[in-house]
Amino acid sequence: MPRPVLLIHGGAGDISDSRIAGKFAGIKQALRSAWGLLSPDNGSGGGSALDAVEAAVRSMELDENFNAGYGSCLNTSGQVELEASLMEGRDLRAGCITLLRDVMHPITVARRLMEKQRHTFLGGAAAQELALATGSERLQPGALVTEGARLTLKEFEDQVAQGKDPFFARTELTDDKPVPKTDPSGETVGAVAMDASGQIVVGTSTGGITGKWPGRIGDTPILGSGTYADNCRGGVSTTGHGETLMRYNLAQRILSAMEYQGLSAQAAADKECREMTKRLGGTGGAIVVGHSGDLGISFTSRRMAWGYVQDGTIFYGIEGQVVHQEPFTLST
């Protein structure tokens, strides 16, 4: 019987020092929210990878330390447009949502699409209609916007006015500003889980990139770029500069390296993240769970928040090879 695994990320990008504590707190809370659904205390092994992934992503969608749900980045019109995808590896079912507004949990809308509808991908008005018809609350316009997101949009606009390309000048954003929540390259949240039955599920959710045009669609809802799950190979959730991830098809390339080159989850993630940045210039990262339960965590961005639980210990990090660990409990 496979050992349950839950690996999550809170986005890759130019994350300032002042935001690290919030990222770590959010990662730990998301793991606490989800782990009990994946590995029940009764030891029955009957936990659900699908429930755990949704719960972990929902937790981060509620947390303004992440670019998903509440606190998502803003487009050029100052609005939040959300995207999410969810995929399960047994039957390759998936639900993909884009251009969703004024709904807190796009990952749940993606699950409802996957489980109850005949389509795989909905956007705009159709996604909005599905969300409201299946129980999502319609929030007041602007309810998902935070002061941090407004400040980051202003910083983006200032860089554009100075003739800079803010989508690639990631280290230009300063560390001494108190809030800016996300750099223009775009952070994302994601989770990959495998339960005791061997079922692999991946979920990814984002607000996109600061300063995007209204109607822009990124990598997160695109299968093979932002999300992919296949019980025969593994599961991948990616994060970073969306246009780069789409062009490179990062998630699928990582799984292909595992399948056809015999690489481990870690080696495949390292190889493809490096090759993507070398060829295209944009940065990003990925978390990977192989079909045997091995883990991969890799990024070419300055930082990427991540965490997982193993043998009663939580492991987490945000930069380089630095790994923090502490005893894991479900209570705060």
From Swiss-Prot:
Reaction(s) the record says it catalyses = L-asparagine + H2O = L-aspartate + NH4(+); Cleavage of a beta-linked Asp residue from the N-terminus of a polypeptide
Q: What GO biological process terms does the UniProt entry carry, in alphabetical order?
A: asparagine catabolic process via L-aspartate; proteolysis
Location of the active site: 188 (nucleophile)
Please state what class of enzyme this protein is. Answer: hydrolase
Q: Which GO terms describe its molecular function?
A: asparaginase activity; beta-aspartyl-peptidase activity
Keyword Chaperone (UniProt): no
Might you give the EC number(s) for this enzyme? 3.4.19.5, 3.5.1.1
Q: Which residues bind substrate?
A: 216-219, 239-242
Which keywords, in A-to-Z order, does the entry hold? Autocatalytic cleavage, Hydrolase, Protease
Q: Tell me the disulfide pairings in this chain.
A: none
Q: Which InterPro entries match?
A: ASRGL1_meta, Ntn_hydrolases_N, Peptidase_T2
Its Gene Ontology cellular component terms are: cytoplasm
Q: Which domain of life is it from?
A: Eukaryota
Recorded hits in Pfam families, A to Z, give: Asparaginase_2 (PF01112)
Q: What happens to this protein after translation, modification-wise? A: Cleaved into an alpha and beta chain by autocatalysis; this activates the enzyme. The N-terminal residue of the beta subunit is responsible for the nucleophile hydrolase activity.
- Stated role: Has both L-asparaginase and beta-aspartyl peptidase activity. Does not have aspartylglucosaminidase activity and is inactive toward GlcNAc-L-Asn. Likewise, has no activity toward glutamine.
Spell out the subunit comment.
Answer: Heterodimer of an alpha and beta chain produced by autocleavage.
Regarding protein family, the annotation reads: Belongs to the Ntn-hydrolase family.
Query: What PANTHER family does the database record attribute to this sequence?
Result: ISOASPARTYL PEPTIDASE_L-ASPARAGINASE (PTHR10188:SF41), L-ASPARAGINASE (PTHR10188)
Q: What is this protein called?
A: Probable isoaspartyl peptidase/L-asparaginase CG7860
Natural source organism: Drosophila melanogaster
